[in-house]
Each structure stands twice: as structure tokens, then as C-alpha cells.
Amino acid sequence: MGFFDKIKAGLKKTRDSITGQINSMLHAFTKIDEELFEELEELLVMADVGMNTATEICDTLRARVKERGITDPNEIMTLLQEVVTEMVSGDNELHLNTQPSVILVIGVNGVGKTTTIGKLASRLKKEGKSVILGAADTFRAAAIEQLEVWAERADVPIIKHAEGADPAAVVYDTISAAKARHADVVICDTAGRLHNKKNLMDELSKISRIIDKGLPDCSKEVLLVLDATTGQNAVNQAREFKEAAGLTGIVLTKLDGTAKGGVVLAIHQDLGLPVKFIGVGEQVDDLQPFDAENFARALFERRPEA
């Protein structure tokens, strides 16, 4: 299955529920008027795009319809793809320009954090990079065990301490091992909780100091893993973590299991955070780099009138 087909399949639930309704609504109109835009805005909010983003999309559509003299309601879907592509375009690449580079992965329990790390390690290894994992989410024994399973599956080394160990010490040992083995990428599973923002900030700043001391000037990504099925709650979670953690991007998992695919737009617009990867299935290669144009095409597919 090709890249676009994977994303299209992963967004099927969102497309079936919301995009189907938008298509039906547009077919019911014979002209483009204010009522059409009001109905469209409501449907976008239902897709977890968020009120502000839905309003912004419709305002942009109004302006373009006027500029281009568009009168056919069925042209709106193509315009929608265009506007959404522009909206979610940004710095979606991973910046891994040094040897080693460091990826810190954070997120609350249950969002698919460990699975994401395993899939990311597999992807980077397939690209010819040597990867080493650090089990620095030491709060849960299960997190360490799950990461070991993924390390074995991806055939990459893992550095771990006992449950309850200092996460910064794990990161220190992982960096030391990476330097000794000339690894290309260090991926550390870090903070899996957000009940105390100060503790989280302290933990992450301590980890950052360890990295800065051990690998000055290294490329560093701080990725937050979010569960798409939680919709607007994912946006709220991202807002909290953004304040505490200096995020560089988002990994949005479980997109295939929800009709809330519009949350990608809310994260991008409300928080200014790029989505770097999306999870669209269970398989290792179902963690896909985010592509704005393919996402917009797959989400707002124009359908011929029945």
C-alpha cells in the first residue's frame, strides 16, 4: 500500500462521518451563500477541528470564493483541500543533523508512546541509521518492559535502569553508550505523566542539561505523543506539555480508530506545533511522516454527486 493510500485508509472514519456529511451538504446547495458557510463551520467543529480553526477556514473560503468568482458549491471541497494544506504545512521534518542526534519522546500513559518509539526506531534503522533506545520513563516498570520488547523487535540496543531510577541518569548512560558506539540517533522514552507540571519541568530541564553537557550542539527533537481518539482533550494536553516541555513537534496516534481526524488542524492552528508523524494502523510501517497535501486530499475527498 502506497503512502497516500495508507493515510487515506487511516482517515476513513473521519472521512466517512464528517466529509461524507460535507459532501452531502454541498450537493444540497445550488449556490454559495452564508447559510452554506454556517453549515460547513458546524460540520468542521464536529470533526474536532476546533471553533477558532473552523471559523478561520470558513473566513478564508469566503475570501477565495469572492476573489475567484466561484459560484458552484461543489467547488468548495477542492478549495477546502487547498486551504487546509496551507494551514497544516510547516516544519514537519525531523532534524537529525548531528551524530548522535537526540529524540526525547513524552506523553501520558496509554497514548501509544512506547509503540511510537519502537516504530520510529524501525523506520530510522531502515533508513540506514544506527539507533539506541533509552528507557527513561522509569515511573512504570511496564514502560521499561514494553520498550525492551520493541527494542528486540526493531533489533536496536536499549539502555535501562531499575524502576524508580533517576530518568536523567538513564539519559546520561544512553548518551555515553551512543558516543562509545558511534550511534546516529538516541531515542529516549521520557516523562509519562503530567499530574504535576513543576515536577515535569524539573525532570525535563535536568534531562536537557545532561544532553547539553554530554552532547553540546547536538540536534534535539522533543516529540509529544497524543491519542487522536481523545479529540479536543489531545489539544488541551498538548497545551499543557508545550508550556512545560519545549516541544518541537507532535506524533498523533490512532488516527485510524477515530472520526476526530480534524484535531490535526486544531493542534497546528491553536498551538503552532507541527505534526511530524501520524499513526494510521498497528503495523510497524503504519507510523507515517506527516504530509500536509496528502492529509488534506485524504480528509476532504471530493465525491461525485450520487
Residue ranges and their predicted role:
Residues M1-K8:
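Compositionally biased, charge-rich terminal segments
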Residues G2, E305-A306:
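Short acidic DE-rich linear segments
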Residues K13, S17-A136, A143-C188:
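Primarily NTPase-proximal linker/entry elements flanking Walker-type ATP/GTP-binding cores
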Residues D16, P304-E305:
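Terminal, Lys/Arg-rich, intrinsically disordered segments and adjacent short helical elements
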Residues M51-T53, R140, D256, V284:
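Short hydrophobic/aromatic residue motifs in ordered secondary structure
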Residues I106-G107, D189, V225, G279:
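Short beta-strand segments
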Residues Q146, E163-R181, H195-P304:
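Conserved catalytic-core segment of NTP-binding enzymes
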Residues A191-R193:
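Short glycine-rich anion-binding loops that position phosphate/pyrophosphate groups of nucleotides
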